[in-house]
Regions:
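Conserved P-loop NTP-binding catalytic core
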Residues: 65-81, 85, 94-148, 153-154
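Short, surface-exposed charged micro-motifs
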Residues: 47, 136, 147-151, 173, ...
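Short polybasic amphipathic segments
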Residues: 34, 135-137, 157-164, 305-315, ...
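Extended helical coiled-coil dimerization/tether regions that scaffold
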Residues: 37, 235-331, 454-455, 460
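Switch/communication elements of ASCE P-loop NTPase nucleotide-binding domains
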Residues: 7-71, 75-105, 316-450
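Electropositive, glycine-dotted interaction segments
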Residues: 146-285
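Coil-to-beta-strand transition motifs
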Residues: 43, 130-132, 143-145, 154-158, ...
Length: 463
């Protein structure tokens, strides 16, 4: 176990180089909570809440850095960690919000006209297998709180709703029950009902017709809400490469890599233009007049980027004599490749105050580095725009490092019928001197695997 250490090692050094855009008050684009029910392993509706509870921590820095106030009634958390055994449903939280984002952005497209909705209800109960799946998200946008959700099955949108509130009470903008709509205070939706298919979201269709509120909400889903897998570097490596084109962002990325003590002095990219073949075989019947399999001139040149890291080379006296280029994919570790891929996205999220979900954040990373990445978010200095990080993890060292408040720690656990529950550590009475890591490993909070007797298995194999 790591020693219990308050604070982060490289926070001060990171803060010195980070260039944050002056975006004003970024509190108004934050996530408040997300709920899902009857989806994958979630039979009942569960809620992941980023609302800070009324608890106070013994370490006051956690309260000062990990929480930001919105108003007198609401404070939000800058990060949340989700723990659980393998196959307990941790990743399904990320999958659920990823589906919601995808459906909001794509359901109204013509390509989805005749397509079934790719939804997976909880399959281990006769009660739910034919019922719709439930999704709801609550978020801040331009000083207003929006609560948007829908129920959907493979054929159609069963219900949909949008509510808005500011300092006053919550008011309904619209509600939908199959093909029945109520538009109380949503003028941009007038005349759009007949244009909304049964398998498309009303909000998405209204946004296509330049609805002001709906357009802002879709941009929030598209630009502010980000989701990635910590196991698939290729998904987000492109953003780091694009960020290297900006001089300021390039400096930040290189400094970020250097501060993590990876033995890297710098980054160099080599762009190679791959000449096209003189001809190619067409399989695009519309573009090429209905022909198929004919040869056509090809003028498209493809560019590939090879990233190299710079390492110092020393003589026998330990004096640096030169620098050596390493191909990052061939010569660097999986962890270094992941950190390079993450760098652009992490720094952009902090720079612009976005929301980032990462499934398996700690995969291929040293526990100390994982902690440092989290500390970048749990800091007023390096996270002045109140970006939010929500991630799944197996790294129990984080529980001993005084990194989180109790309301930032979440668990997933399956019952004996295969249904996942999601709950927070704040629901438990935890003593001031309690070792969260030890108590979690010992099963005090649940969400651990129940492992069978392997000795019996080995004995059977030898019989």
């Amino acid at each position: 176990m790591l020693a219990e250490v308050a604070g982060c090692v490289i926070i001060e050094r990171i803060a010195k180089f980070a260039r944050y855009t002056n975006l004003g008050d970024r509190r108004q684009v934050m996530l408040i909570g997300f709920s899902v029910g009857n989806y994958k392993s979630f039979k009942e509706t569960v809620t992941l809440s980023l609302v800070a509870s009324s608890i106070t921590e013994e370490d006051k820095e956690l309260d000062e850095n990990n929480v930001f106030p919105i108003n007198d009634k609401l404070s939000l958390l800058k990060s949340a960690a989700i723990y659980g055994a393998n196959a307990s449903g941790k990743s399904n939280i990320v999958a659920a919000i990823n589906f919601m984002k995808w459906f909001v952005l794509n359901s109204s497209k013509e390509t989805q006209v005749s397509e079934a909705i790719d939804i997976e209800a909880f399959r281990l109960s006769t009660e739910t297998e034919k019922e719709p799946s439930f999704f709801e998200i609550v978020f801040l946008l331009e000083d207003k709180t929006f609560r948007y959700g829908f129920e959907v099955n493979a054929r159609e949108v069963v219900s949909e709703w949008l509510f808005q509130s500011d300092d006053s009470e919550e008011k309904m903008l619209f509600e939908r029950d199959f093909d029945n709509y109520i538009l109380d205070d949503f003028p941009e939706g007038q005349g759009i009902i007949d244009k909304t298919r049964s398998n498309a979201l009303f909000l998405s269709v209204v946004a296509q017709f330049n609805g002001k509120i709906s357009g802002k909400i879709l941009r929030w889903f598209s630009k502010t809400l980000q989701l990635i897998s910590g196991l698939e570097d290729r998904e987000y490596r492109k953003q780091t490469l694009e960020s290297l084109e900006n001089a300021g962002h390039r400096h930040d990325i290189i400094e970020f890599i250097k501060k993590l003590d990876l033995g890297i002095l710098g980054i160099d990219e080599i762009k190679i233009n791959i000449p096209p073949p003189v001809f190619f075989i067409s399989n695009n019947t519309e573009k090429y007049g209905g022909s198929y399999g004919n040869l056509y001139p090809n003028s498209e040149t493809k560019t590939t980027v090879h990233v190299h890291t710079l390492h110092p080379k020393y003589d026998a006296d330990g004096k640096q004599t030169s620098k050596v280029l390493f191909d990052i994919e061939k010569h660097e570790s999986e962890g270094t490749n992941k950190l390079f891929a993450l760098a652009g996205l992490l720094l952009d999220t902090l720079r612009t105050g976005k929301i980032l979900f990462i499934d398996e954040l700690d995969a291929r990373l040293h526990p100390l580095i994982t902690r440092e990445l989290i500390c970048l978010f749990n800091s007023n200095e390096t996270n002045p725009h109140n970006a939010q990080l929500i991630f799944t993890t197996h790294d129990t060292n984080l529980l001993s490092s005084k990194t989180f408040r109790k309301d930032q720690i979440w668990f997933t656990e399956k019952d004996n019928k295969g249904a996942t529950d999601l709950y927070s550590l704040v629901e438990y009475k935890v003593g001031k001197d309690a070792s969260l890591e030890r108590d979690y490993i010992m099963g005090k909070y649940g969400a651990i695997p129940f492992i069978g007797n392997f000795k019996e298995l080995i004995g059977e194999l030898h019989e």
